[in-house]
Every structure is written in C-alpha cells, then in structure tokens.
C-alpha cells in the first residue's frame, strides 16, 4: 500500500515536472493572407531541427491548410475526434523531420463552440498526448471570438504575425489590444512577414513596439522579420516547407534566427516562468463558466 502510494506520488511529481517544461504557443494574425500558417509550420520544423518535440495543431477550422503546405492528405482531421472509435492518436499525423501535426477540417465553426461534454473530451484527449511534446503550437484562424480568446488566455505565449501593409498593422494592433485587455500578463511576440527590405522589417517592428508601449503600456517581444522571398511561393507550389525546400534561402535563415532568438529568450526567463497550467486553464475557462 505504501509502495503504491509512493509510486503514485513519483508519477504525479514527474508529470508536474514535465508540464512545467511543456509550452503552448498560439500563432495568430489580425487578418488573413499574411502567411501565418507558413510561419507556424516552418517555425515548428525549425524547433524539430533543434531537438524539440512539437505538435502542430491546425486550428483554422474550415480553412486549415497545414496538410496542403506539407503536401499530405490527411485521412482524419480534428473534427473526427468526436466520431465513434476515433482517438487523438488516430488524427495525429507525422510530417517531415518527424513533426507531429493535426490537420484542420471543414464543417466545424469553432471547436470550443459546443457542449460541455465534448469540450471535456477534447481536453482529455489532448492532455493524453501532451507529455510527448516540448511544444504544442496552435495555428489559429484569423479573427477573434470570445471562445477563441479563452484558448489564447490559457497558452503560455502568443505570436502575432503581420506584414508591413497598413491594414495588416492596424488589425495586428487591434488583436494585441484585445488580448492585452483580457490578460495583460500574457507574453506577446510579433513577427513581420514579407518585409521588402531590412529597413522596412526593422522599422515595422519598432513601430509596433512603440505603439504597444505608448497606448497599452505593453512590452512586446520582437521575434524578427521574414523577408519577401520567391523561395516561399515556389515552395508552396511544390507543397514543401520552404525551410526544407531551400535551407539557404533568406526566408529560411530568417525563420532559423527567429527560432534561435525565441529559444534563447526561453532559457533567459527559465527561472521566472510560471508553472504550466494550460489544461487547468482550459477547464477553468470552458467548463467553469
């Protein structure tokens, strides 16, 4: 009896230690068409190349394209998890670099816009596999809703992808303001995609940081910028992630730098980071309302 209790305690401690190490990241944009999914995918692959176990979750339900960017046909999507005799193990697929991913689907407006029993089941299924991964990355759809906000409040970090265009910047600021007002402690990282020059990329990042600091009192973390690069469009046509299509391309090098910058920042704040309560927060926000 004592031995069983001791073993149970060890397992609980081990699980808590792992949960402290596992991180949930949500990647989003204020508007569609800024290359968010491409950034999510290639960032995930760059993490894999650095020895991190990653689950990339296509949450752009109804318009998901991670599987298309990978050139893979998925027999199951996230909506299948609610079908009889289908578990999360059935819908997780393996891509290049042994990247685990879950494809989006059609016919479901919002995965959390459903009854409590299904939400509970979804959370339990995701938690079932979470111990295998260092990072769970949610590639979110464009736009905001109250239910999506609850998911964002539960993750550890927010990545906002934008382009230098004024409309994209306006939407990016509106998105970060919405999130900041809901949880001012949530770390927000910004990435400028398709910068036409180094000057444009740097100035766009500086402008976003200054505006957030002045009007929100928010310190943004700059991930960097990805330059406009024909390699990206060529890779999309070939249905191959550009990081693998041409590792020496400017866009590929930028994603590598962005990944290394993020990991270095993670090491720097290792002593300060809060315990991982992602699943506890999901339950709190979705099941205890």
Explain the meaning of each model-derived region.
Residues 123, 169-184:
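Conserved C-terminal guanine-recognition region of P-loop GTPase G domains, centered on the G4
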Residues 125-132, 145-167:
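Inter-motif core of Ras-like GTPase G domains
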Residues 216-243, 254-257:
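Beta-strand-loop-alpha "switch" segments that mediate conformational coupling across diverse proteins
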């Amino acid at each position: 009896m004592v031995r069983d209790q001791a073993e149970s305690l060890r397992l609980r401690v081990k699980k808590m230690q792992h949960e402290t190490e596992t991180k949930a990241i949500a990647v989003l944009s204020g508007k569609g068409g800024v290359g968010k999914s491409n950034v999510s995918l290639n960032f995930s692959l760059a993490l894999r190349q650095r020895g991190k176990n990653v689950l990339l979750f296509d949450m752009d339900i109804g318009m998901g394209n991670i599987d298309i960017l990978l050139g893979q046909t998925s027999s199951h999507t996230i909506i299948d998890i609610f079908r009889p005799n289908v578990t999360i193990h059935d819908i997780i697929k393996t891509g290049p670099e042994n990247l685990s991913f879950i494809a989006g689907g059609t016919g479901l407006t919002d995965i959390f816009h459903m009854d409590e029993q299904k939400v509970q089941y979804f959370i339990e299924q995701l938690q079932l596999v979470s111990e295998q991964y260092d990072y769970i990355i949610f590639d979110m759809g464009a736009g905001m809703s109250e239910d999506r906000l609850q998911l964002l409040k539960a993750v550890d970090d927010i990545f906002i992808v934008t382009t230098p265009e004024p409309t994209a910047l306006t939407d990016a600021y509106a998105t970060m303001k919405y999130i900041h007002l809901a949880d001012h402690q949530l770390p927000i990282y910004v990435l400028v995609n398709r910068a036409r020059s180094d000057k444009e990329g740097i100035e766009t990042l500086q402008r976003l940081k200054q505006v957030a600091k002045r009007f929100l009192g928010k310190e943004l973390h700059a991930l960097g910028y990805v330059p406009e690069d024909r390699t990206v469009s060529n890779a999309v046509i070939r249905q191959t992630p550009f990081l693998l299509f041409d590792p020496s391309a400017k866009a590929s090098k930028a994603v590598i730098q962005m990944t290394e910058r993020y990991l270095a920042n993670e090491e720097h704040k290792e002593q300060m980071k809060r315990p991982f309560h992602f699943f506890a927060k999901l339950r709190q926000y979705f099941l205890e309302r």
